[in-house]
Amino acid sequence: MKEFPKNYNFTENEKKWQQIWQEKQIYAYNPNVAKEETYVIDTPPPTVSGQLHIGHVYSYTQTDFIVRFQRMMGKNIFYPMGFDDNGLPTERLVEKQKQIKAYNMDRSEFIKICEEVVESEEEKFRSLFNQIALSVDWSLEYQTISPLSRKISQMSFLDLVQKEEIYRTNQPILWDPVDGTALAQADIEDKEKTSFMNYITFKTAQGDPLTIATTRPELLPACVAVFYHPDDGRYKHLAGKSAITPLFNEQVPLLADPLVRQDKGTGLVMCCTFGDQTDITWWKTHNLPLKTIITKKGTIDFQHETSIDGLKIKEARTKIIDILKEQELLIKQEDITHTVKCAERSGAPLEILTVPQWFVKTISHKEELLKRANELNWHPKNMKIRLENWINAISWDWCISRQRYFGVPFPVWYSKRVGEEGKILYADVTQLPIDPLKDLPVGYSKEEVEPDYDVMDTWATSSVSPQLSTHGISDDFAVNKDRHDKLFPMDLRPQAHEIIRTWAFYTILKAHLHQNTLPWKNIMVNGWCLAEDRSKMSKSKGNVLVPEKLLEQYGSDVIRYWSANSKLGADTTYSEDVMKNGKRLVNKLWNAAKFVFIHFDKLKGEDKKASLLDIKEKITNEFDKWMVNKLVELVKLATNELQNYEYANAMHLTEKFFWVVLCDNYLEISKTRSYDEEHKNPQGQYSSILTLYHVMQTLLKLFAPFMPHITEELYQILYSENSIHVKGSWVNYSDLNYEINAKGAEGLLEILDIVRKFKAEKNLSIKTPIKLLEVSGIVLSAELAEDLKNVTSAEEIQFEMKDDKIKVNIIL
């Protein structure tokens, strides 16, 4: 008989098992297994943009609970890890780390620095993900900036061009003047800002005064019309007339339009190109001229005696207001708080510029995408409304051009050849991946083309994250079509709720456009990890928790336990109390296993190898049979919860069974029989040990998806040298049930509870002898009565049925 280790050292054991799992390739994907037997995960590729925090652990471990369960259920698991290492987030990290600015450097030099930084940052992620025991197959790793990913992303672009779902046009777009790039609607956030509503005097062409209210007087030089509501009786007389702008004396038409709010300001609104989306609508609807006065750097480009040329937006606003005051053209100012559209990354207020960009058709597909949202299995279900709300709110096609550097280039050039100037030239699929700054289109010389200098929105590549792993886009565009067909659509997309409008939406859009399908069958949405005061963790607040310190203090299994205690989709707080409970559970598992281990050498070898169903007849004691029935019920419930992605419920059920049913009750009740030092009941002893053997084995398997290290260590000490985490190791007791009256065992537990409370109230040890237990309301079988005598230290028990409810009289 081998010895049970004295203590459990989580630091040593977790490192040991992580290394063994890697060496033995426990989590390796098998490409030869049929598609129907494979479970495929579209793992979120973390953005390489900054410090690792406990939120990474929180979200990724929740996915791993489901993955480990599916593997143990017999699925061949395709569980890759990617790194979203291209695009603006990475550029901002590099600029901050290296104290540089991309636009001040040679493009190729900046890209080289980006590549060095992401390689270093990705190694930190790999280390953390291994420490928290993510059961990924690292041979499936990808980077969104790798040559293969660039090839697949460019394939996606060409496929959508071929399907006429992508177009290039010179139209108003959202522009971030800080990062110097166009943005998509999903890249913006609304911020409440204080400002002034400025009431300014215009005049009609006939010299009559008009008062117009605006928050952006600096756009006066770009004013192309003044609007009023067609039902506004105050201004109907202005129909067909013109207005003269103050300071700049430009004549612009006075026009009626139903989009004007009569109750806002004075009911007269100036239309500038461009202050907001309404300006764009009016500009298009009324065929107005274009006056561009804002540069890509967010400064004014307008030569005039007001001398606002070259000023930043805020500076120009202040100067215009001062001049209006001097010339008595500013009637009044009102303090207001209004919503301003800002860049999600830089935080800068956005401008609307007219710049040639690439767009993916989105608005025309809104109804189809709403249907796709309904076809998808949402976990939890209430997250679907977030996608539906976003789809309904979309008012722009998806702008995928970015005026940056470290990203996937467009496989595009523009011809300078005589007679076809400006013609768009696309790369041949056999050329991919290409960089138009270095490569050339087939049949053209360097002098005959102008490359597209832009790169794609990082979401344009992240939106094909399933395809980055499957190595294909469609029937016409694939690196490995057989692999793609086998893995796509995938089974699961895990992700956070705040990127439903971006990552989930764009991935669904791309799959719909490429192959008229969903990208996955299920989406599993996690919440945020909040600080203990329920505020969002942020470095500025100093409340970010670093995983390394927690891993050093508690170990991976305890942190995973904390993560498993939060329901899917719910925001949770970091809790020291939950961490301590997890540590307590690990210790209790160790001690419970140590207790049952000392009895296992009394079992026959063939009974240890047999399944619980095969040795069913050898469990003879009534309370043992009740225990097995409860175990079977637990397995069914926990399995059902995990199949429905409700890992927290499965964990709670298993933990409660372990503490209450096993440790508090069964171990104590069966202890005398298990030891049977006087050999009074060898059959009862064998029955209890066999029950303990299978109960502990089953519980370790139920805990295994959540706490992989302690369960592996105990499983190999108690049961097998094979890993507990291998494919098909889950338990299935669907055909197992003992035909017994559960009221007897439950009555025993009720009596025991009464006795325990009695002794506790009198400050007596649980082992304090009892002369007589007088029990009414139930009569236990001889086996159960014997177990009750042993656990309560009763010399004698008398039963009678005179009461409907159980009552106990205790005589010491």
Curated annotation (Swiss-Prot):
This protein's record includes keyword Nucleotide-binding: yes
Chain ranges for the short sequence motif 'KMSKS' region as given in the UniProt record: 536-540
Compartments, record wording: Cytoplasm
Chief site of localization: cytoplasm
Keywords: Aminoacyl-tRNA synthetase, ATP-binding, Cytoplasm, Ligase, Nucleotide-binding, Protein biosynthesis
Catalysed reaction, written as an equation: tRNA(Val) + L-valine + ATP = L-valyl-tRNA(Val) + AMP + diphosphate
Top EC group: ligase
InterPro entries named among the record's database cross-references: aa-tRNA-synth_I_CS, aa-tRNA-synth_Ia, Anticodon_Ia_Val, M/V/L/I-tRNA-synth_anticd-bd, Rossmann-like_a/b/a_fold, tRNAsynth_Ia_anticodon-bd, Val/Leu/Ile-tRNA-synth_edit, Valine-tRNA_ligase_type_2
Catalytic activity, EC: 6.1.1.9
Coiled coil residues, start to end: none
Residue positions of motif 'HIGH' region: 46-56
Pfam families in the record: Anticodon_1, tRNA-synt_1
Annotated ATP binding sites: K539
Gene Ontology biological process: valyl-tRNA aminoacylation
GO molecular function, one term: aminoacyl-tRNA deacylase activity
SUPFAM superfamilies in the record: Anticodon-binding domain of a subclass of class I aminoacyl-tRNA synthetases (SSF47323), Nucleotidylyl transferase (SSF52374), ValRS/IleRS/LeuRS editing domain (SSF50677)
One GO CC annotation: cytosol
Disulfide bonds: none
Subunit structure, as described in the record: Monomer.
Domain-related comment: ValRS has two distinct active sites: one for aminoacylation and one for editing. The misactivated threonine is translocated from the active site to the editing site.
Family named by the database record: Belongs to the class-I aminoacyl-tRNA synthetase family. ValS type 2 subfamily.
Reported function: Catalyzes the attachment of valine to tRNA(Val). As ValRS can inadvertently accommodate and process structurally similar amino acids such as threonine, to avoid such errors, it has a 'posttransfer' editing activity that hydrolyzes mischarged Thr-tRNA(Val) in a tRNA-dependent manner.
Name assigned to this protein: Valine--tRNA ligase
